[in-house]
Amino acid sequence: MTQDYETVLKGKYPAKEHALRVADYVKSKVPDATGILYVEGRMTKMLEDNDEPEPFRQRRYFYYLTGCPLADCHYIFDLATSKSTLFIPPIDPDSVIWSGLPVSAAEAKELYDVDEVKYTTDVNAELARLGKGPKKTVFAIQNQVLDSITFLEFDEKNFSILKDAIERCRVVKDDYEIALTRKANAVSTVAHHAVVEYVKKAKNERELEALFLQRSVANGAKNQAYHGIFAGGRAAATLHYVANDAPLEGKLNLLLDAGTEWNCYASDITRTFPISGKFSKESRQIYDIVLKMQLETTAALKEGVIWDEIHLLAHKIAIDGLHLIGILKGDKDEILKNRTSVAFFPHGLGHYLGMDTHDVGGNANYADRDPMFRYLRVRGALPAGSIVTVEPGIYFCSFIIEPYLKDPVHSKFIDSAVLEKYWDVGGVRIEDNILITKDGSENLTPTIKDPDELEKIIQAS
């Protein structure tokens, strides 16, 4: 059942529950583990040759265990007592006049799901106290410990398990994390719809990016999950196009791939629509193929399905569609066997989504010799509670396709005369955020994708 995410988000981020899950994983790998888990948040870093700080993005491993967005913090979880302690910066009287009063320890205790809050001036003393005793181990993350932090009292220092433990736990989301993703999707949808309504009036891609950012911030999402893609015409054939600065005149479609972040949790949504308000014949043909790819692969999702097989299904649907309109020709089984469809659908079907847009835990194998699976960011079975993007696409990128046209293995399956009519389509991608459940899935993305509805909105704007 769809929960009221706003009600869920009135509670605290369940950091203690996350810490207990991570601790259980560590103990499963080191059964006699005693000691602590130790993580640090991101530290304030100044711009080079400047007295301004770099834009701050909280370290995700730290946030997962604390729910704390503050800079310059530390965290300890005692494996023996399951006590969690957050360390925050003390008040610096010299900075108050510039920045105002920071969060106090008492306030932080009310805000974050931890057992105790102390100041960072106490970190090393607390580490020394907890390290006393036989066979104590500190579990920390390699290259994420300040030089000023000392683990001298601990018999062992393990820098290999904790990162993996957090990443594995992050794959399966709890109700609060799902609510954060719903909220991010809701705000992103407002911004997406604003762009659809304005696209016919826009002269340049940058106007649309500015509008998306404005609507995001106005609705409380100050951070984007990633650099948005506002690709007009043939630029849509570039998968991660980020220039967003080209004129729109004379171009058929806009590919909009953008998502806001809500309290460190990402949304990742892509829509493609006609700038004029009416799809060209070729654009609509490709759109319908991609929409079928997305709807049918999403319908096949549930706990335990193998993502590789869902990706393969997407290619089969793409081959059927491209064969029907004449771009591909010959035996469809041979087209699949020779991987010719990779020329038009060169990326993976999707990825895990969470605190990072391309979230952890996917077990990708970029050394795979099979080009159909090489860029698949998730491999293996999907657990219930995971969130994946489903983002099939068909693209007409000359740099990618032309080598296929010159290769006799592939060229016999591609009708270059028919293909010539499709270059201006650029690329079509449709992307939603999907929650995997025991018996199926739930689409968390309410953004309009019906092609007739998109045309109506643009024409009426």
UniProtKB/Swiss-Prot annotation:
A Pfam family reported for this protein in Swiss-Prot or TrEMBL: AMP_N
Catalysed reactions listed for this entry: Release of any N-terminal amino acid, including proline, that is linked to proline, even from a dipeptide or tripeptide
Biological process, per Gene Ontology: proteolysis
Binding locations of Mn(2+) 1: 268, 391, 431
EC number annotated for this UniProt entry: 3.4.11.9
Molecular function per GO: manganese ion binding; metalloaminopeptidase activity
Cofactor(s) named in the record: Mn(2+)
Residues reported to bind Mn(2+) 2: 257, 268, 431
Tree of life domain: Eukaryota
Function: Catalyzes the removal of a penultimate prolyl residue from the N-termini of peptides.
Similarity comment: family membership: Belongs to the peptidase M24B family.
Protein name, as recorded: Probable Xaa-Pro aminopeptidase PEPP
Annotated source species: Colletotrichum graminicola (strain M1.001 / M2 / FGSC 10212)
